[in-house]
Amino acid sequence: MSLLARLEQSVHENGGLIVSCQPVPGSPMDKPEIVAAMAQAAASAGAVAVRIEGIENLRTVRPHLSVPIIGIIKRDLTGSPVRITPYLQDVDALAQAGADIIAFDASFRSRPVDIDSLLTRIRLHGLLAMADCSTVNEGISCHQKGIEFIGTTLSGYTGPITPVEPDLAMVTQLSHAGCRVIAEGRYNTPALAANAIEHGAWAVTVGSAITRIEHICQWFSHAVRR
């Protein structure tokens, strides 16, 4: 059975929770062994896949995990706003470190490497692809290229103001267009995750609400202030 078929079966049987194990950069939790522990805990609690950033983290997580890993590399570039897996060598490094699925910024912004070239390199390694999109048009374009997973990852993050609520309308429109939608971005409660599924998402990625202790503590700290 192919990886995609196994993942489809897992989503059908266990629900579509994907956990993004990305600690706050530079925080006490930002260590590969802690990221690996987070990933193992998430998988044991029902996550059908995990999303891991960085080669060292990925190499540490891979031996301990049987569920699929979505791999990314984040960079801060001077000549482009694109941050997620911008280079061909990033794809190569993620493949060699054990990623099953490689996600990349698929927005229609200035970029060092075009989407088709990134997709071709992912296919060269025999891996699945995920397009992190900011708009419906970007998602449909990537779906038409044969990209397996269309994420709403960048919705609300390419403009000056980030909304509080997730973009459920984008989920609905992409689902109606036939995309295998991974809802991602501001799904920080079980109710919002359930709403994404109700709006047609194939799976939902949750990050900060599960793996960023600093964010969770701040939510509670602000709530109990007098």
Curated annotation (Swiss-Prot):
A GO CC term attached to the entry: cytosol
Reactions this protein catalyses: an N-acyl-D-glucosamine 6-phosphate = an N-acyl-D-mannosamine 6-phosphate
NCBIfam families linked to this entry: PRK01130.1
Entry's EC annotation: 5.1.3.9
GO biological process, one term: carbohydrate metabolic process
Pfam families, per the entry: NanE
InterPro entries, per database record: Aldolase_TIM, NanE, RibuloseP-bd_barrel
Molecular functions (GO terms): N-acylglucosamine-6-phosphate 2-epimerase activity
PANTHER family with a match to the protein in the record: N-ACETYLMANNOSAMINE-6-PHOSPHATE 2-EPIMERASE-RELATED
Recorded family membership: Belongs to the NanE family.
Described purpose of this protein according to its UniProt entry: Converts N-acetylmannosamine-6-phosphate (ManNAc-6-P) to N-acetylglucosamine-6-phosphate (GlcNAc-6-P).
Gene this chain is encoded by: nanE1
This protein's name: Putative N-acetylmannosamine-6-phosphate 2-epimerase 1
Keyword terms: Carbohydrate metabolism, Isomerase
Organism: Salmonella paratyphi A (strain ATCC 9150 / SARB42)
Pathway given in the UniProt record: Amino-sugar metabolism; N-acetylneuraminate degradation; D-fructose 6-phosphate from N-acetylneuraminate: step 3/5
